[in-house]
Amino acid sequence: MQNSFHPNNFTIKEINLVKVNTKIVNKKMASQSNLVSRGTSGVIKGKNEQKSNFKHLSSVSFSKASDDMMQEGITILASMRSEGPLSPEIECMASEFKDAIQGDINSVVSPMKLRLHKSEDTSKVKIGTMASLVAALPGQSYPFYRIDRLKIIYMPLFSSDLAEGKKITFSINDSSVRIGHGSKTISKTDAPLNRMSMIELHSPFFVPKDNIKMIEFGYKTTGVPVSGRAFAFVCLAFYIQRDFIPVSIKKKDPIILLIDDIDRPSDINTTSSMKKLVGEVNKRIEKKKGKFNESMIKYEKDLEERNSRMAFVDNDQDSGFHVSEKAEPSKMKDTLEGVHLMEENIPDYLPRRLPVYNWEGAILDTGAPDHWFYNPNLIGLQEDIDSVGLIEGRTFYRVRGVEVKLGAHWIRMKEILYARKRDMPLISYMRLCRAKIVDTLKTLEDGSAVLCKNGKVIFELTCTGSYMVFKKSGDTSREMMTE
């Protein structure tokens, strides 16, 4: 039975996002026990797990303690910030985590490599790759993927005064591009080493399916001596955008991992407990609790109103949408002014082969307000240095000086907006009228529409939902229309 497409059947965080749970395996870490010194805990074991190689090291399970922590809710823990009130983004993020995280900790990770000299830094730790996230996605495979958001809750459990002013850096990296001795950093965020933080990373471009294993995410501490390092846990929630097709959401538990750094106390059970920690946190934020809840309700309401008219599709199998990985062949059309810009050339205007190959399905932009809603594919995208035709807007992009085939006609536009729910190009009705390419928009009895000039049909449109799409045509006019 198909689910209803009505927005009321979806929570705010389910809109056009895919939350992914990935199992992190500790085999590689356990095999590198020779890198761990006597003062470390090595690989922290899960519930009832025993490793003979680490008998001399203390171990602890957070399964029981997590019940107390989750009962209070990540929303409450998120309020433990010393520097003023939380931002709206943090409040919304905390709300999502409160609903998403339930039960025991899913997985536990320790650094694969440790440098044991007190003057050295902790080596950068790779938590996982984009390929491991995509492998957990349900449904069919897509030609492009990107990490829309990687949400992180970082909470240090132990830290000395020497960690004051120091930081831990979480990052997403592209290992296919080398800069010096390391990989190119796509996105990174710093957090105080000894304070709780809620941060967010994103990957600003689509990556072809064959290359997603090159996109890595991890963390690193910098300039912190052994005696000042923190012992902390991190919650990760992944939102993956597949190509440009909206998909329904199947909620998954986020990953929780424990950063086990060198100076962890030898016996965590006698030093502190999660239950005690939660109690202390509750006392610290009691005064902020009312204000926090009011702000959270306000932003949830704003988000719900903003997304109330967004389109939804159900499960991949039932959606009726399909992304072909084989582009239709097209020929370049020579004119006196040069060569037309075809589908094959469009990715050259966009960062990292962002898939825009359906220009014949462009949307007629009549100025409807729902054309300008938040678009998760486009927020945060950076302008490519070599892509002079691409100009970044707040919720859309402008591609300037483009020649495209709309229906049966070629048209040279000074500017085309690239935005909206499905990431189709937006062709401005106002621009077409001002350029005297068309003068009338008429709706027909069968529900379709036409753009006319002096009574002659120039473009045919199909009406889908609240917007109109240019009909595809195999015929091509010899005339080049210019804005």
From Swiss-Prot:
InterPro entries: 30K_MP_core (IPR041344). It holds the Pfam family 30K_MP_core. This is Uncharacterized 55 kDa protein. The lineage of its organism: Viruses, Riboviria, Orthornavirae, Negarnaviricota, Haploviricotina.
